[in-house]
């Protein structure tokens, strides 16, 4: 890797760290190509990115971002999973880790808060941003629906009463 490629890699990783809502650091221990491809596919489907990077370049890229606390985690064969949704990357990595023992969750971070493996697993158990939005919209719509039902119910009852009087009179 020449100097320009290294600079390009650092710039790319810096962009990933700048846009990420959460970052998960993993250690791949003898994964097959098929497993690695499956992991990358699962992470991509979750809307996250997954990058195997040289530790020295990752340490340079993380400097000046909220994720500077991750510097100590970049030892050994590490990979970086990052997503704008704070839960997506963690959820994808934890779900994949359940299927194989070839991947180790080293830790992660959400903003400047550094997480250990248990913290990443706890983050993965939380609902995603889309799930929270759906729940919130459901909660907001429920009172409006009830109000609409209440405002139309008296009018419908009144119409039935008038209809009954009209039938009696006829």
Curated annotation (Swiss-Prot):
GO cellular component, one term: large ribosomal subunit
Single GO MF annotation: structural constituent of ribosome
SUPFAM superfamilies tied to this protein: Ribosomal protein L10-like (SSF160369)
Keywords, sorted A to Z: Ribonucleoprotein, Ribosomal protein, RNA-binding, rRNA-binding
Biological-process GO terms, alphabetical: translation
PANTHER family, per database record: 39S RIBOSOMAL PROTEIN L10, MITOCHONDRIAL
Oligomer status and interactors: Part of the ribosomal stalk of the 50S ribosomal subunit. The N-terminus interacts with L11 and the large rRNA to form the base of the stalk. The C-terminus forms an elongated spine to which L12 dimers bind in a sequential fashion forming a multimeric L10(L12)X complex.
Biological role: Forms part of the ribosomal stalk, playing a central role in the interaction of the ribosome with GTP-bound translation factors.
Family designation: Belongs to the universal ribosomal protein uL10 family.
This protein's name: Large ribosomal subunit protein uL10
Source species: Novosphingobium aromaticivorans (strain ATCC 700278 / DSM 12444 / CCUG 56034 / CIP 105152 / NBRC 16084 / F199)
């Amino acid at each position: 890797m020449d100097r320009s490629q290294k600079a390009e890699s650092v710039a790319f990783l810096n962009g990933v760290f700048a846009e990420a809502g959460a970052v998960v650091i993993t250690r791949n221990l003898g994964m097959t190509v098929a497993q690695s491809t499956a992991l990358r596919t699962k992470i991509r489907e979750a809307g996250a990115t997954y990058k195997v990077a040289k530790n020295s370049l990752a340490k340079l890229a993380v400097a000046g971002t909220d994720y500077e606390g991750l510097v100590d985690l970049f030892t050994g064969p590490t990979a970086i999973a990052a997503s704008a949704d704070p839960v997506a990357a963690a959820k994808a990595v934890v779900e994949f880790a359940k299927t194989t023992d070839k991947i180790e969750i080293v830790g992660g971070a959400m903003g400047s808060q550094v997480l250990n493996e248990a913290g990443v697993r706890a983050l993965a158990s939380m609902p995603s941003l889309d799930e929270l939005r759906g729940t919130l919209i459901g909660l907001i719509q429920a009172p409006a629906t009830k109000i609409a039902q209440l405002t139309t119910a008296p009018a419908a009852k009144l119409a039935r009463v008038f209809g009954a009087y009209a039938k009696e009179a006829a």
